[in-house]
Swiss-Prot record:
It holds the Pfam family Bromo_coat. Residues 1-20 are annotated as: Disordered. This is Capsid protein. Its main location: virion. Belongs to the bromovirus capsid protein family. The keyword RNA-binding applies.
Length: 190
């Protein structure tokens, strides 16, 4: 029989309650690392009730000094109608370049534009490969936009000084959003 710090013996019910309470406290929140380009370089925990989803996409073929659009596609578990209404918090875009990529590459997230060249003039933040950290961080720019509107109204724009082959850049977008609603029970008769 174990004893508590006071020296009194705990009965089985008290031991089980103590173990259960410790288990409930072990909740790990995903972390958005605030990029160095934003000036603070401090890792931030997501707010309570929020989680982070990563969207990863490869680039299409890009001609030299041309801007192309890359659409944002929701993962399957968020494409359910109930989850499309979840509100967005912060967004981070990170660039992953192959060693063969030459010249400056820029990426931004804005509303869909008629002319892709206009996108960088309206962007709140731009991930630039010529900077120390190729990332863009949107703190309040798209706050409280739903995930459905994020997919429908926003687009990632990519600019390259040199011509790029397809799949030579990985664009990773981390979106902090309200926790999704999962179906917790299954019934074959429902």
């Amino acid at each position: 029989m174990t004893t508590s710090a006071t020296g009194k013996a705990l009965n089985r019910k008290q031991r089980r309650a103590l173990n259960r309470s410790n288990r409930l406290r072990k909740e790990f929140q995903p972390v958005i690392v605030e990029p160095l380009a934003s000036g603070q370089a401090v890792s931030l925990k997501t707010r309570t009730g929020y989680c982070v989803t990563q969207f990863v996409s490869n680039n299409p073929e890009v001609k030299a000094k041309e801007v192309v659009s890359v659409s944002v596609k929701l993962p399957d578990h968020l494409a359910v109608e109930a989850n499309r209404a979840l509100k967005v918090g912060r967004i981070s875009i990170l660039l992953g370049l192959l060693p063969t990529v030459a010249g400056t590459v820029k990426v931004c997230l804005t509303e869909k534009q008629d002319s892709p060249a206009e996108s960088f003039k309206r962007a709140l933040a731009v991930a630039d490969s010529s900077k120390e950290v190729a990332s863009a961080f949107y703190v309040d720019g798209f706050k409280d936009v739903s995930l459905g509107d994020l997919e429908k109204d926003l687009s990632i724009y990519l600019y390259s000084e040199a011509a790029l082959a397809a799949n030579s850049i990985r664009i990773r977008m981390e979106v902090e959003h309200v926790m999704p609603k999962f179906i917790t029970r299954f019934s074959p008769f429902a």
